[in-house]
C-alpha cells in the first residue's frame, strides 16, 4: 500500500482528478446497469404483444410439441394468437393442436411435421406453402438439440455433432428465411430465438452446443439491425437451466424455473435489453439475469476462471451420468 501511495503521489493533481473521475464513472455505469437489471426483472413490462397483431394473428413456433415450445404455444394461444406448430412428431402436434382448440374459442392451428436434422429443402418449401397468405406476426425459433450428456469434443459422436449444428443453426436460419419476409412485408413482427448461457460462456464438454448457441447470439444481433427499419423486432432470449427434457432436470429451484414460469417471463419482458452486453438480447428469468450479470461483472464470462469452473462442473455432470447409466445397465 505504501508503494501505491508513493506512485499516486507522483501523479499531478489534475491527473489524480481525471483518474478518480474515470473510476467513479465506471462504478456509476456498473451500478446503473445493475439497477436497470432489477427494474427490468421486477418492475418494468416488455413490449405488448398486441404490437405485432390483433387477435387471430398467427405465430409460428418450432420445436412446438414439448418443453418450452409447447409452453410458448399454450401461452400465445391464451393471448389470442393462432398457431403454426412445427416439430418432428405429427401425433404430438395433433394432440397439442386439439387441446388448444378445445380450450380457446375461435383458436385455429396448423401443424407441420418435419425433422430439422434432415436439412431437407423440400420441407422448408412445404412450410412456405403452408403459411402462404397467413397474417403472421411472431416467429419463435425454439427448435434445438444439445448433447445427450457432457462429452469431450474428440469423443463426440459424429451424428450428434452434425445434428446439433444442423438443427440449432441451419434449422433456425432456414425457418427464419421462410417466415421473416412475411413479417417484413407487413412492416411489423417479432422474432424470438432461444439462446443459452452456453452461448455466452464457452462451455467445455458441451463445445459443439456452446458454439452453436454463440453463433445464434451474433446472428440474431446482426439480424436485428438489418430488420429494424422494416418494423421487425429481433431478440435473442438467454436462458440457463429450465425443467425440460433437454436439461433432464425435474425439480424447480431459485435458479431453475419450470417452462410456464420461464415462458411467461420471456413473453412479458420482450424488448428489455438495456442491461445486456449484446444488442437486442434479454435474459427474462430474474435469477438467471442476476447470475449472468454477476459473472460478467466480476470474474468475466470469457475468463480462464469461468472456463475452468465450467469444465470441472461438466466433468462432474458427465461422471454422474455415466455412473447412473452403469447402474441401470446392471439392472437389465
Swiss-Prot record:
Topological category with respect to the lipid bilayer: Single-pass membrane protein
Single Gene Ontology BP annotation: very long-chain fatty acid biosynthetic process
Catalytic activity: a very-long-chain (3R)-3-hydroxyacyl-CoA + NADP(+) = a very-long-chain 3-oxoacyl-CoA + NADPH + H(+)
Molecular function via GO: ketoreductase activity; very-long-chain 3-oxoacyl-CoA reductase activity
Pfam families with a match to the protein in the record: adh_short (PF00106)
CDD domains in alphabetical order: 17beta-HSD1_like_SDR_c
Residues forming the catalytic site: 209 (proton donor), 213 (lowers pka of active site tyr)
EC number(s) given by UniProt: 1.1.1.330
Pathway: Lipid metabolism; fatty acid biosynthesis
Spans traversing the lipid bilayer: 15-35
N-terminal signal peptide: none
Binding-site residues, NADP(+): 60, 115, 123, 142, 177, 209, 213, 242, 244
GO cellular component terms given for this protein: endoplasmic reticulum; endoplasmic reticulum membrane
Keywords: Endoplasmic reticulum, Fatty acid biosynthesis, Fatty acid metabolism, Lipid biosynthesis, Lipid metabolism, Membrane, NADP, Oxidoreductase, Transmembrane, Transmembrane helix
Cell compartment(s), UniProt: Endoplasmic reticulum membrane
InterPro entries the record matches: 3_ketoreductase_fungal, NAD(P)-bd_dom_sf, Sc_DH/Rdtase_CS, SDR_fam
Main localization (coarse): endoplasmic reticulum
Assigned protein family: Belongs to the short-chain dehydrogenases/reductases (SDR) family.
HAMAP family: 3_ketoreductase
Chain's role: Component of the microsomal membrane bound fatty acid elongation system, which produces the 26-carbon very long-chain fatty acids (VLCFA) from palmitate. Catalyzes the reduction of the 3-ketoacyl-CoA intermediate that is formed in each cycle of fatty acid elongation. VLCFAs serve as precursors for ceramide and sphingolipids.
UniProt name for this protein: Very-long-chain 3-oxoacyl-CoA reductase
Species of provenance: Neurospora crassa (strain ATCC 24698 / 74-OR23-1A / CBS 708.71 / DSM 1257 / FGSC 987)
Amino acid at each position: 500500500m505504501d508503494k501505491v501511495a508513493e506512485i499516486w503521489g507522483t501523479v499531478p493533481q489534475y491527473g489524480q482528478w481525471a483518474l478518480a473521475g474515470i473510476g467513479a464513472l465506471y462504478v456509476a455505469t456498473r451500478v446503473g446497469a445493475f439497477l436497470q437489471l432489477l427494474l427490468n426483472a421486477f418492475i418494468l413490462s416488455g413490449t405488448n404483444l398486441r404490437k405485432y397483431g390483433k387477435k387471430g394473428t398467427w405465430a409460428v413456433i418450432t420445436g412446438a410439441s414439448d418443453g418450452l415450445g409447447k409452453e410458448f404455444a399454450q401461452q400465445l394461444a391464451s393471448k389470442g394468437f393462432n398457431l403454426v406448430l412445427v416439430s418432428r412428431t405429427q401425433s404430438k402436434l395433433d394432440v397439442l393442436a386439439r387441446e388448444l382448440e378445445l380450450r380457446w374459442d375461435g383458436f385455429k392451428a396448423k401443424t407441420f411435421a418435419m425433422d430439422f436434422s434432415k436439412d431437407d429443402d423440400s420441407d422448408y418449401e412445404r412450410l412456405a406453402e403452408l403459411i402462404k397468405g397467413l397474417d403472421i406476426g411472431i416467429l419463435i425459433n425454439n427448435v434445438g438439440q444439445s448433447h445427450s450428456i457432457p462429452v469431450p469434443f474428440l469423443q463426440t459422436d459424429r451424428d450428434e455433432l452434425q445434428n446439433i449444428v444442423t438443427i440449432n443453426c441451419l434449422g433456425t436460419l432456414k425457418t427464419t428465411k421462410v417466415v421473416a419476409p412475411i413479417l417484413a412485408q407487413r412492416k411489423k413482427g417479432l422474432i424470438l430465438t432461444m439462446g443459452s448461457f452456453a452461448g455466452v460462456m464457452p462451455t467445455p464438454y458441451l463445445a459443439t452446443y456452446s458454439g452453436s448457441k454463440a453463433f445464434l447470439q451474433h446472428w440474431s444481433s446482426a439480424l436485428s439491425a438489418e430488420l429494424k427499419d422494416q418494423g421487425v423486432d429481433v431478440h435473442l432470449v438467454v436462458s440457463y437451466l429450465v425443467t425440460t427434457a433437454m436439461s433432464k432436470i425435474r425439480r424447480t429451484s431459485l435458479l431453475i424455473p419450470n417452462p410456464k414460469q420461464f415462458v411467461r417471463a420471456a413473453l412479458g419482458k420482450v424488448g428489455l435489453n438495456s442491461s445486456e452486453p449484446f444488442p437486442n438480447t434479454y435474459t427474462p428469468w430474474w435469477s438467471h439475469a442476476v447470475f449472468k450479470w454477476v459473472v460478467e461483472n466480476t470474474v468475466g464470462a470469457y475468463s480462464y476462471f469461468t472456463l475452468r469452473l465450467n469444465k470441472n462442473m461438466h466433468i462432474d455432470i458427465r461422471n454422474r451420468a455415466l455412473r447412473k447409466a452403469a447402474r441401470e445397465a446392471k439392472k437389465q
